[in-house]
Structure formats: C-alpha cells, structure tokens
Amino acid sequence: MNAPASIEAVLASLQPREAASHDFRPRAFRAWVADLPLANVAETGRRVHAALLEMNRTRLPADERLELLRMLARPVEEVTAAVRRHFVGRPLPLPERGRKAARVAIELARQMALGFELAAREAVRGRGSQLAAPAAHGALEQLGRALLTVYQAYAPPPPELWRSLHRVYGLAEAHGLTELPASGPGRRATDVTATAGAAYKRLLLLSLACPYRMRQGEVRAVYEALAEWAADARLEPLGDPVRQEGLFVVHLDSDEPPRYRSLDRAACTPASCRVLDAAPLGERLRAALAAVREEGDEPLVTGERLTASLLRRLVLNWGVMPRRGFARAASRTPADVLVGLSAIHQRLRRERTPATEKGAGTPPQPVPGIEAVISGRAHFETGLPQAGGVPDVWDLAFDAGPPSGSPRMVVIDEDREERRPEPEPEYPVHRCRVEDISPAGYRIHCEPGGEGELQLKVGELLAVREEGEARWQLAVVRWAKCLGAGKLDVGVQVLFPDAEPGYARRQEAGAPWVPVLIVPEVPSVQQPASLLAPPFALRHTEVVNLRGLSGRPRPVRLARTVENTGCFAHYHYAAAGGEEGGTNGGEDDLDSLWGSL
C-alpha cells in the first residue's frame, strides 16, 4: 500500500476524467461525500481510500483537485481518529489489529499527500500558480501526519516516505514557494507553520527529537509544539563546512531522515544537501522550560503536554551531539525479563522470603486506633438479657422481648462474614535475547511465544537477568521499535544492579500501603538512597512511612523526583527522623541516641 516512488510515472499515467468510475465534478463529489456512512468507520475508510486511489490516477485541474481533497479532509480525519485507538495507548508489541490500524492511517495520509503534490505540480505548470503554495503545504502536512503515526506506532518508516517529503520540499524550493503563506479553510492568519518551509522543518526536527525514545503522548506534544517553533530553525544550502553553522544535514535525493553532519559519509553537494540549524530554537526552549518549572513536573499527567524533563531532552537532541559513554559489545545471550513494578516486586519478594515464614513479605497492617474506630463499620448485637441482670428500661416496651421460639442470640456483623482473600495475580517471566550490551544498558530482542504475552511501553520498568546470573538488574525502556509479527527491539538503560522489595504509605488517614522497590545509599559511588514507586501513589517532598520485608516502618522524606515516566516514579529519599507514630521519649529515644554517638 505504498505510494509510487516515481512522481513522473504517476504524472505520465494520468487518465481523463471520463474514464473514472467516480464523478469528480465538485458538485457531484460533494453529494457523494455527504452520503458516506461516517458511523461505519470500516466502510467509510474503504470508500474514501478507493476514491483517493482513483483521483490520483485521474487528470484534474489544480483548483478542482484541491477542492475535492478538502472535501475528503473531514472523513479522512474521522477514520484516522477512529483507528488510532487501536495503537495509541496500547502496550508493545502491537497486535496485528494495531499494526493494521496504523497502516490504514499512514496510507490514507500518503494518498492525500500524493493528491496535494499532484495539484502543486499541475499548478506550477499552468495558470493557477497561486495554488501551488497551499498545495505543497498540504502535501507536507499530510506526510507529517503519516510520520507522526509511524512514530506513535514505534514502526520503521515505510519505504519512500522520506523521499516523498524531500521531493515535495524540493518542488517548493525550486519554485520559490517555501515562504509563501498557505491560505485555506480553517487556517489562522497567525499560523506560523502555514508555509511549506516551516512544515518541512517541523518534520525534520520531529525526527531529530528521538521520537522512539518518547511515550506516545510526548511525541504528539512535541509535534504540536513544533507548529509554533519550527519557523525559527534555519535550513540553508550546503556551504563552507567550517563557517556554516548547523549540526544536521538533509539529503534531498535520498529516502533517509536528517542526520548529524559529523557522522555523514555520503556524497553531498549544494544542489542535493541542506544544512539544518536548530540553534535559534534555544530561546523558545528556554522560555518553555522556565514556564513548566514554575508549574513543576509533579503531578505528571499522561496527557499531551511538555514537561521539564522532556524539554531538557529536546535541548540536548537539537543542540548537542550525543556521545556514547560506553562501547557496545555484540551479544546473543538469553535473558529473563520481568515487565512492570508489580511483577518485579512479586518476584523479588518471593525469592527473598523463606517459605517457612508465615505471612512474611505481606503489607504491614495498620494498628487499630481512633482512625479505625471512626472509619470502621457499625457493629450491632441483639440477645436475651442475662438472668439476674439489671432490667433495662426498654424492657417495658411490649415488643422488647425476642420472638417466641427464637431464644437464641443473633449477631449481625457483616465484617465477620467469612471472606476469601483475592488470589495474587501471577506475572510471567519473558524469555528474550540480549543483542548489544554495555555497562549502561542493553538492546533486547523479544519474539512471541513462551510464558505469557510480552507487553510494555517506553518508560516501563524492567528487571533483566542474563542466563547464568543470580541477580535481577533494574532497567527502564528508553526506546522501542516494532519489527512486525510480534517481534520487538527495545533499548534499556540499567538503573540499579539490585533492589529490595518493600512498602510505602503516605502519612494520612486511610492511606494504603503500596509496593515499592528500595535501593540503599552507596556513598562510595555517590548513589543516594532511591525509591521506585507507582507513578501517582506518592508525592514529591512529602514524608512517607517506608519498610522493607523485615523491620519496623520508618519515616522518610521524598527529597527529589528523578523522573516520572508514567509507568513508575523514581525518587531520592532521606531519613525524616523518628519512627512511625512518633516517639515516646523513653528507651527508644535513648537507643537512637547511642547509635548517633
């Protein structure tokens, strides 16, 4: 379902309007669009795709083609929005249905883009040259939507996608259209990306933002932000490599995204290469970073917004060429992988709790006190008065005694009914393969099969244990790529070589104990004490009660949020002083004093 690679071949094979099965006269086509069954997404998508395929094989005037494409904009958007739910917010690797949904969204956008490109080429050759700028912009905008879908599906770009992007920009540049405004329905006069040049730079910068290292909402947030930022970047023909600024180079005659100039080994000429300088975006990024710092990253929401941590990564991606801190070594070592904090906590707890210890490793239960009295359920008992007891004044009532034939006491207490504890879910151990290894992390390859179905997201917490090793290393997924057929490559960064399972609870009435992973302080390597917790269970700077599998709870303060990926939160913590429930001023205080001396 790929668009043709050669636009010349498409132009040469255009058929007259009379040969088409669809009536592409504007009035008739508007009626056809109005009759689309929008409630039936599959049928609407099938009809729209068929109409686009035939339209792109039909010779039409530029103005009519643009009018027809704008009629199809709303149905295409509705179909795309409907199929997005099959791959946005879904764990990786995507199932077959999710991959097909992404292909549908990409294909519709590419066919729309081809139609806009045909209109642009027809406009620059005919009398409607004023239509060429909006047509070229429309093509780049549609190709951008296809590229956004590629990144949100963590899929490799389909063949010829980047070639189409470069080709449309080359057409706009050759005819002086890159800075001309693209007017059209729904276009704001202040829309700074409403030029072909800005739309092209937006997509170059998106690809350079390391989108495979982002969560899907972050990719969308950067894409939306670049609608305002992209115009600030500079794109120039290749010049003096010493004097010309710009870290990135673009090959207009290739099917490749932009890359670092220092790593580019391909032949480059002023006619075929452009240099992208993202340095002018620095002021925009600094202003955005200052704004989000005032709000803070806590609590982190899962919506599409820019956070301080994301902006800092963008500054590095667009302004400084990253250097690998450690050399990679090839490997094909089998490894066991646990996905998610709950699975890791369960495995570590079971491995470190002797089977003979009854109840070990379970969450601590709160001591009954005034909170339990206030929040507990009411308890009612009725029964016969004891013989010889003092009569109650209510015994004078005619119905105070028990019914005849029921001389036994009745206890009504819902909480005392026998309840079966809910079984703990069993989390699978996945068998994968370590492909590349370095002191900082791994590239792991996973295929379908084995115990359970592997499902993860970028930012997920993993535990990895290579074959022959005894300990689980904690790691975080930094990037992912779906390779099709359920295969998945993930890049992970090792966080800690080990951790202790434990529990934490906020210091407020009725707060539950939540599972956490505790990493002790290691002063020799300047590693502060760390806590890995569910993403929204605890709050930055608050004091929580913390305990391991053994020992009493102790209060600690969450001193700093290292990161919150939306899958887990990483905090540095420090002792807050005292034990849970306060001190009694007796021997416990003296014991702590001897220890400090």
Question: Residue locations for each model-derived region?
Answer:
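Long, leucine/valine-rich, helix-dominated scaffolding and oligomerization segments
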Residues: 2-211
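N-terminal start-of-domain structural block
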Residues: 10, 16-19, 289, 294, ...
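Generic hydrophobic, helix-prone segments enriched in Leu/Val/Ile
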Residues: 108-112, 116, 288-289, 310-320, ...
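Extended, domain-scale alpha-helical bundle/helix-rich regions
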Residues: 185-381
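Short strand-loop-strand
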Residues: 320, 324-471, 479-499, 507-597
